[in-house]
């Protein structure tokens, strides 16, 4: 976001109308970006910072699709949802294959490069979007936040998004937060990018971030 602010004139960006959008790990990063302030996570240099500093990483809208919000809690979440471990293992074989030779037992630990079961309380706070929400956000300074999650997600339990919604609603109010749970949508479900859902997303951005050109499922690049 620092870099986007720095090149705003070159590309015609309006720094007062930034929305940040992420799915899964990107959803986590979107929330932590929108909830942190310019004094946090500022140790990583970006191109042009010496010439253009100070610039802000502030965003006006956060779009979080099924992001993980609390490391080390997913096993408890799935137990609460009564989803057997073998079912989750079968559903996430594609992820397990990716970490097979890394030395980590689960995707969370691989992503953090540390066994999440050994995280200290300070480390949990440092990595948790919920911590930065409680620390930094108020009704006056909070971005608008859209949270979408599927109730058939076997990679990130939807209870993570429910807790995020509950915390945000308490701290910044219902006017700033919109949460939708999609029935029978799995992790990274293609249905989220149907023309109907993209139309709803466009309406949300038009309402909260300013006019957005039409986009459809065929024009979205997903990494």
Language-model features: where?
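Active-site catalytic pocket residues across diverse enzymes, especially alpha/beta-hydrolases
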Residues: 8, 37-41, 82, 124, ...
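Short, proline-enriched alpha-helix->beta-strand connector loops that line the catalytic pocket
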Residues: 55-60, 136-145
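Mobile cap/lid helix-loop segments that gate and shape the active-site cleft of serine hydrolases
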Residues: 43, 76-137
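Primarily recognizes the serine-hydrolase "nucleophile elbow" in alpha/beta-hydrolase
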Residues: 2-79
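Aromatic/pi-system hotspot detector in well-structured domains
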Residues: 1-6, 66, 141, 145, ...
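C-terminal catalytic histidine-bearing segment of alpha/beta-hydrolase fold enzymes
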Residues: 143-151, 155-223
